Amino acid sequence: MIEVIDGQRQLKACKRIVVKIGSSLLTANGQGLDLDAISHWAMQIADLHNAGHEIILVSSGAVAEGMVRMKLTSRPTDLPSLQACAAIGQMGLIHTWSSVLEKHTIQTAQVLLTHDDLADRRRYLNSCDALQNLIEWRVIPVINENDTVSTDEIRFGDNDTLAAMVAGQVHADLLIILTDQQGMFDSDPRSNPNAKLLTTVNAMDDALFEMAGGGGVLGRGGMVTKVRAARLAAKSGCPTLIASGESDHVLSRLMSGELLGTLFSTDKDRITAHQQWLAAHLQTAGRLVIDAGAVEAIKQRHRSLLPVGVKAVEGHFNRGDVVECVDQSGQRVAVGRVNFSSRSAEIIKGLASDKVHQVLGEARSLEMIHRNHMAIY
């Protein structure tokens, strides 16, 4: 009961909110954009906007709209066709959002991003500045992944993850992911009729992945992906709420303090802007496999990664590149800027600090990755 009350207070106190709306809530059973549904969303968004909330909208639906415009009955599987559908459908998607929000005297702006945009330091900072200006001007950014120029992101990426990255970028108070599911259950409700809806969970609880299920046809983000997104947002100190967009006036009810769906809470402090940029790297130049002692030192004691804790070096990278650190089961532990090239890292892996000096000389850094240049998962 205390957790529910705390969750209600937490929701009511949120000012800057990233709202992600999935394809199934914006399309008419996959038959293109549903103008009535989008108009209804616009009304709720306008209510929050007029109440003083700062809304950043992450909207899916471009590929589904493109399919209808090209009279396709099934989602293409080849990359060029998917990219073409996204390009065609994005025209309709942004026009629809602009039109319905303009009726509420709200100005919108289209922002198309890829993971590469967020991984490049300069482009990341530029997009941060642009989003900040839009928010200050009381303009609602309508953000989507730039599927037309994406490569593997269009097959493996998703707007849940993009929304979590944006939440970190803009220092959001809350990420809301609206879907066709009620929230997070303790088991898959499609196979277990006795599955229970979880009201509040800790975003960093590893057990959540065991409870998550799959996704729908037009959308790409199943519950596993949403849990990962909630964890990514949590690293920036941002809680996530996953709720059913099919509930009446769900946004208005949530922001009035009604706790619907599942709140993924976080006890983590906000990480620095540099660490947020590091955390945005879903793809890295290489990776370091580290032992249990190094995992404990990084996650529990917030220490730097030393060569002695590195068991294996994978990929080709240069000094200053961003690499990921994984445990010996392959689970990502952290990402960070490495102080050695892959060639040097291979030479010094597993060596104690005094041995590193003997091999590479006194002038070189002792840390494989310094804690100030690391984002922990």
Curated annotation (Swiss-Prot):
Record-annotated PUA domain positions: 285-363
List of residues binding substrate: S60, D147, N159
EC category name: transferase
CDD domains linked: AAK_G5K_ProB (cd04242), PUA_G5K (cd21157)
Name by which UniProt lists this protein: Glutamate 5-kinase
GO biological process: L-proline biosynthetic process
The species this protein was found in: Acinetobacter baylyi (strain ATCC 33305 / BD413 / ADP1)
Pathway terms, separated by semicolons: Amino-acid biosynthesis; L-proline biosynthesis; L-glutamate 5-semialdehyde from L-glutamate: step 1/2
Catalysed reactions, as listed in the record: L-glutamate + ATP = L-glutamyl 5-phosphate + ADP
Keywords: Amino-acid biosynthesis, ATP-binding, Cytoplasm, Kinase, Nucleotide-binding, Proline biosynthesis, Transferase
GO CC annotation terms, alphabetical: cytosol
Main location: cytoplasm
Gene encoding the protein: proB
Family in the record: Belongs to the glutamate 5-kinase family.
Disulfide bridge partners, by residue number: none
Function: Catalyzes the transfer of a phosphate group to glutamate to form L-glutamate 5-phosphate.
GO molecular function: ATP binding; glutamate 5-kinase activity; RNA binding
Known EC number: 2.7.2.11
Gene3D superfamilies: Acetylglutamate kinase-like (3.40.1160.10), PUA domain (2.30.130.10)
Keyword GTP-binding attached: no
Subcellular location: Cytoplasm
Amino-acid positions noted as binding ATP in the UniProt annotation, renumbered to this chain: K20, T179, D180
